[in-house]
Amino acid sequence: MDSILIIDDEPQIRKLLSRMMELEGYEVFQAADCQSTLKQLKLHNPQVVLCDVFLPDGNGVDMVTTIKKLYPELEVILLTAHGNIPDGVQAIKNGAFDYITKGDDNNKIIPLISRAMAQAKKNVGEKVKTEETQSFSFDAIKGLSLIHI
């Protein structure tokens, strides 16, 4: 089942977003801060992360870098109540899939999650293909010698 991790320090926001995602058929996990995010990522390995920018123990924009370093295949969407251009630009540079303002048309978030989920699946497929290609490279073949006829 496709899964999403929702990170927000406001329980009402987490509950609302979780319900929306569950109605779309996603399995949803929740975290309230950066520390619990890392635990949830390790436990559940979601494909998409929906993360608030302002968290009690850190910043979502910076958290994107950490998440993408540990889990490069997953996609991160940042949500903020007070969006600004510099944060948005930095979020994208850090590897975020998108940066959106809370309260924007809620009808936009469902297709955005769907696109992020598709990209995350594509990322996994590309990783598998790369690993398979590397396993057949000459560097991976060790200890083999030519048979002389």
What are these regions, as identified by a protein language model?
Residues 2, 11-29:
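Two-component/phosphorelay signaling modules centered on CheY-like receiver
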Residues 8, 52, 80:
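Active-site residues of response regulator receiver
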Residues 14, 56, 80, 84:
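The feature encodes the CheY-like receiver
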Residues 33, 59-62:
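Acidic catalytic/metal-coordinating carboxylates
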Residues 39, 61-73, 90:
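Short amphipathic alpha-helix used as the core "switch/output" element in two-component signaling
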Residues 44-50, 55:
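Active-site beta3 strand of CheY-like receiver
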Residues 129-147:
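AAA+ ATPase active-site-proximal loops
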